[in-house]
Amino acid sequence: MLFKKFTWVIPSLFLTIISTSLLISCATKSDNTLIFNISLDHNADTSIEKFFTVFSKKLSGKLNKKINVNFNIVDDSFTKINNIQANKADFAFVNSQAIASNNWFGYTPLIQTLTTAFKEDLELDYYEDGNLQKKAEKTNLLFLSPPYKEWDDIKQKWTGNRYDFLYEPSKLVSFYRSMILITGSASEITAIKKAWNEKNWNQFMKFGIGHGQTNSASRFELPDLLFRKHFAKNYPGLQNAINSDPDKFAVVRGREIGINKNIKIVFDDANSFSWTQNIKGSKRPFYTPIDPNDRLEILTYSDPLLYDIGIVSNNLSRIYQKAIGEIFIELAQSSEDLYGPSIGYNGYKMINDFEKEVVEIIEKTYGK
């Protein structure tokens, strides 16, 4: 099967650091009690409790029987999958990397999460389409004028979660990307772009590269995959390059670009500045080089990776599975979804053709 081509090592540490209470259902499993494993970007509060109260009521109505939906907070996608396979949970949202690396037994990919599209990234296109740098150039016009350190909550439409001026509110997409940020003097920027356009990996690397942990999709994996396509045989792979020339690499977040003068290229989530509030009066504004003469811009974006996927236990009947997916969609459409928007889910869609809607997209990004 396709997913056997993806090799992942799941550290045993996951099983020891996750509290036992997160691995065991919070109620005795029965036909009328379902357990959802969820992630939160904030502490569980009354809004989350209310969400599951509403969800339980709607599910009970669809199935014409009393159903209670309880939840556990579990952040790791592999643990969520294991819980469903072990019959300790019935539903969970997991990242697409975990789906790609799993044997896909005991559960069904049910719904695809969606998020509001960025203005200049509305289509699911790839490196070979030749549009990734064009997207970056168009986004730079929004990102850099005015520069981030001058962004204002009112002018740039800060909502409390994001800067709305960067988004296309009427468009939902199922994917995200990594971005490659570059900084330096005018001559350095020109030289970095020259090395990129000439596909000269050795020259490109000399400018210093900031990356994330090896298990980070946006800050390690997606840039690595992009470089494999772009630099081709001249590229040894990101980890091999780090091992060979460690002085040319460092762990750096995108918002910290320009602090380390030896690092001119940094990987980050695409448009991470869109949800990072500019703190007026800060002595060290994010996305702002220390040297006032240095510039900053997005060089390019990576290929896409799918947003989180809702998976459901195969121990549930198809009627149960379908009802769960429909309720998520209905709550989002009626603006009653108190959970999804808190972690970036602005909508959902049923997965009708797993091979086409999930497998083919993953294959195209990872390479067949």
From Swiss-Prot:
It is a lipid-anchor. Its main location: membrane. A lipid is attached at residue 26 (N-palmitoyl cysteine). InterPro entries: CypI, CypI_dom_I, CypI_dom_II. A lipid is attached at residue 26 (S-diacylglycerol cysteine). PROSITE patterns: PROKAR_LIPOPROTEIN. Keywords: Cell membrane, Lipoprotein, Membrane, Palmitate, Signal, Transport. Pfam families: CypI. Residues 1-25 form the signal peptide. It is found in: Cell membrane. This is High affinity transport system protein p37. The gene is p37.
